[in-house]
Amino acid sequence: MAKKVSAIIKLQVAAGSANPSPPVGPALGQHGVNIMEFCKAFNAQTDSLEKGAPVPVEITVFEDRSFTFITKTPPASFLLKKAAGIKSGSGEPNTKKVGTVTRAQLEEIAKTKEPDLTAADMDAAVRTIAGSARAMGLNVEG
């Protein structure tokens, strides 16, 4: 028989640096999950990613306090800021542009994000990422 799900916790944790301090500790502790076990497993799974990149993670906690987790790809905004070489997006994206991204960079980001996007094909995925770039105040070339 399948285990009963007790809770689903969604967090955004820096790759390779999960530790028991907030936000991880309190979120898992209130559901009785072994926090260190999660931290070790998460850090091992995100070793290949860029250290410090924010990684969304969905943790499924079962009634017997065991858990499974699924890591997603880093947010598009993080990848776009890295590609454009900026610290943050524009406060006024329609009037004040803060950087530029090329079509090739958008395609690279779309390839990275492909597992998490619901786009029908790669062109639609690139358009989705381009829309995110424009909303952040980035010029899109190409």
Swiss-Prot record:
<dbReference type="Pfam" id="PF00298">
    <property type="entry name" value="Ribosomal_L11"/>
</dbReference>
<dbReference type="GO" id="GO:0022625">
    <property type="term" value="C:cytosolic large ribosomal subunit"/>
</dbReference>
<dbReference type="GO" id="GO:0006412">
    <property type="term" value="P:translation"/>
</dbReference>
<dbReference type="InterPro" id="IPR000911">
    <property type="entry name" value="Ribosomal_uL11"/>
</dbReference>
<dbReference type="Pfam" id="PF03946">
    <property type="entry name" value="Ribosomal_L11_N"/>
</dbReference>
<dbReference type="GO" id="GO:0003735">
    <property type="term" value="F:structural constituent of ribosome"/>
</dbReference>
<dbReference type="GO" id="GO:0070180">
    <property type="term" value="F:large ribosomal subunit rRNA binding"/>
</dbReference>
<protein>
    <recommendedName>
        <fullName>Large ribosomal subunit protein uL11</fullName>
    </recommendedName>
</protein>
<dbReference type="InterPro" id="IPR020784">
    <property type="entry name" value="Ribosomal_uL11_N"/>
</dbReference>
<dbReference type="InterPro" id="IPR020783">
    <property type="entry name" value="Ribosomal_uL11_C"/>
</dbReference>
<keyword id="KW-0689">Ribosomal protein</keyword>
<comment type="function">
    <text>Forms part of the ribosomal stalk which helps the ribosome interact with GTP-bound translation factors.</text>
</comment>
<dbReference type="InterPro" id="IPR006519">
    <property type="entry name" value="Ribosomal_uL11_bac-typ"/>
</dbReference>
<dbReference type="InterPro" id="IPR036796">
    <property type="entry name" value="Ribosomal_uL11_N_sf"/>
</dbReference>
<comment type="similarity">
    <text>Belongs to the universal ribosomal protein uL11 family.</text>
</comment>
<keyword id="KW-0694">RNA-binding</keyword>
<dbReference type="InterPro" id="IPR036769">
    <property type="entry name" value="Ribosomal_uL11_C_sf"/>
</dbReference>
<keyword id="KW-0687">Ribonucleoprotein</keyword>
<keyword id="KW-0488">Methylation</keyword>
<comment type="subunit">
    <text>Part of the ribosomal stalk of the 50S ribosomal subunit. Interacts with L10 and the large rRNA to form the base of the stalk. L10 forms an elongated spine to which L12 dimers bind in a sequential fashion forming a multimeric L10(L12)X complex.</text>
</comment>
<keyword id="KW-0699">rRNA-binding</keyword>
